[in-house]
């Protein structure tokens, strides 16, 4: 379960919809899907900041969303995402966009899911936050499925490229550079 997969394709072909189907945020309108009942998935989206409870601090949000651990455990987890010291006590609405993204990513990672599903995760991130995300994903022991137009993220994190065209998901035999080259030549 340590696969690193990028799903690419033109805007509007259904990449985000596919991810929502995978994590159960949407239901199929036809056909069947099967998933191991013990499989845990977590999703981090381009709208990740929307999941934050803005009046709460990151520490308070963890205590509310995932009760039962010690403050030290929450703070240690937040610290591994760069939310340290007084930052963990500051209301979410006072955090920068990059800091909010780190809090949201730490929330997605709390239960150590088997597979992390990311939908345009670098939107709204500064370069430092993008690099921190890349390091975190490369150190992550589970599987990763990413929808992104960010060539640096995909090239640095993903080992497989899958593309959607004409409502079909197909594995691409090559890396992201090869995919872009084939696309520019009109061969996909």
Regions found by a protein language model. Give the residues of each.
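ABC ATP-binding cassette signature C-motif
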Residues: 1-188
């Amino acid at each position: 379960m340590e696969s690193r997969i990028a799903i690419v394709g033109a805007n509007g072909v259904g990449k985000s919809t596919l991810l929502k189907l995978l994590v159960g945020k949407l239901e199929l309108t036809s056909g069947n899907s099967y998933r191991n009942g013990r499989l845990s998935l977590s999703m981090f989206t381009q709208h990740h900041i929307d999941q934050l409870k803005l009046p709460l601090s990151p520490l308070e949000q963890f205590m509310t969303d995932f009760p039962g651990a010690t403050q030290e455990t929450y703070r240690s987890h937040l610290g591994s995402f760069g939310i340290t010291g007084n930052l963990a006590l500051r209301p979410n609405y006072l955090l920068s966009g990059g800091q909010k993204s780190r809090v949201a990513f730490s929330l997605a990672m709390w239960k150590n899911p088997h597979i992390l599903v990311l939908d345009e995760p670098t939107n709204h991130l500064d370069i430092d936050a993008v690099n921190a995300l890349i390091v975190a994903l490369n150190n992550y022991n589970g599987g990763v499925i990413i929808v992104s137009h960010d060539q640096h993220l995909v090239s640095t994190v993903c080992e497989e490229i899958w593309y959607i065209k004409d409502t079909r998901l197909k594995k691409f035999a090559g890396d992201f550079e090869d995919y872009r080259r084939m696309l520019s030549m009109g061969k996909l």
